[in-house]
Amino acid sequence: MNLDLAYRSFVLGVAGHPQVERLIKHRAKGLVRRYVAGETLEEALKAAEALEREGVHAILDLLGEMVRTEEEARAFQRGLLELVWALAGKPWPKYISLKLTQLGLDLSEDLALALLREVLREAEPRGVFVRLDMEDSPRVEATLRLYRALREEGFSQVGIVLQSYLYRTEKDLLDLLPYRPNLRLVKGAYREPKEVAFPDKRLIDAEYLHLGKLALKEGLYVAFATHDPRIIAELKRYTEAMGIPRSRFEFQFLYGVRPEEQRRLAREGYTVRAYVPYGRDWYPYLTRRIAERPENLLLVLRSLVSG
């Protein structure tokens, strides 16, 4: 295992301890504000409006993972519906992202499908695009099944995510081609065993570019979710060399990460979106951000010292 993946594994392991969670929640509020738009829908909409003024579109994401009861799943669905209704009147592109575990995937695929179907029935006529996030490897197959089911039911304003660090992803991409998916490509942020995921960052990066170029060659619309300057530069070079119009792809960033680069790409004429998370259940999201970059851990330590 290389140092990058060893660091990520260490951080995700430590962050799972209840004492660490309590400490960060109590003393690292400055870091939370950097990466999370707020705990309320109103705060998230204000953050989205600020991004729009800079030429960057927003992806709204109500945080929350792995509900334990059907009642919790339905409560989370109500939060999603409130988000859809709030976006309906906005003049800018409307886009939300969600995880199927938030809608009860671990309880029942039928429950998650039914709740998501109701969200899409409200979202599509209001011009709200819905992205299904991909979670850890045990949930990939179920997520893909539900995506295919929704497309076969006629829903078109729904997209999927694939992760370049999983060995299976190229086959998943090829299997999805008949559905002409709107694809978000990510490297992957979950702690995965070497049996299912590439153990080396260089291999993950190479696979990311391979999958991205393959998707473009197949005519898919691709959202490249990456902060890696080398990958962004190569994708810009490749699309220009191949004559692929900028209307066929976009770049996506996390809220608070490389904001200057977001604005620069937007000024260059690329479509740029920032993933804007909000809600009270922000801790799992924040720990994955800390695990992605060692400098984020330094910010946590400073926050813990300064309070």
UniProtKB/Swiss-Prot annotation:
Coiled coil: none annotated. It comes from the Bacteria. One of its GO terms (biological process) is proline catabolic process to glutamate. Inhibited by L-tetrahydro-2-furoic acid (THFA), L-mandelate and L-lactate. Inhibited by N-propargylglycine. Its EC number is 1.5.5.2. Binds 1 FAD per subunit. GO terms for molecular function: FAD binding; proline dehydrogenase activity; protein homodimerization activity. It holds the Pfam family Pro_dh. Its cofactor is FAD. Gene3D superfamilies: 3.20.20.220, 6.10.250.3270. Converts proline to delta-1-pyrroline-5-carboxylate. Has significant activity against O(2) producing superoxide during proline oxidation catalytic cycle. Belongs to the proline dehydrogenase family. Homodimer. This is Proline dehydrogenase. It comes from Thermus thermophilus (strain ATCC BAA-163 / DSM 7039 / HB27).
